[in-house]
């Protein structure tokens, strides 16, 4: 009498956005050669066939799908920036040539990996010899609280801290300098009688508490005064 094989449930940890090789497991007291099949797709993320345990093959998009690799491995990856406990759970069965096992569950806990913030490029227009308030901006897919720092001083002109968006505070004279205003504002003024496209370009970075973004340039185009 044939004894059903047993598919073995397991729990694995994977890092967000990084391939995870998973070896499916089963046993059979009759010693039959076992076939593995995916029977429930991941709750989130993607499964792939593999021919060597490290290289992605075809995406597994339907069920049941037989595992093609003799070592009964698949590759899992989370949806972009996705993470959480039980995030990527999927199901599989084993077949001993006669019948399928009950479904076993592979529990996949995806660990959050910090994503760098992205400082936002912008171009602003300023008038010669007149203060210009500039609001720095950035985004972070992790939703972290961001701080801002000036990383390159203006090509020409001056930058100032501000506490209200209109009053000059300390002159920013070195880099990196953290922007003190909670609304990430700074004040720019051209060099005396200076103007031109790109006259006041400067650079900044955003920090998510773990790491800096790449530097982004604020392009400051200064218009000349209209002389009477």
Label each residue range with its predicted role.
Residues 3-9, 115-121, 226-228:
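Proline-enriched interdomain boundary motifs that mark the N-terminal boundary
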Residues 14-16, 21-33, 39-115, 126-131, ...:
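Acidic, turn/loop-rich segments in luminal/extracellular domains of secretory-pathway
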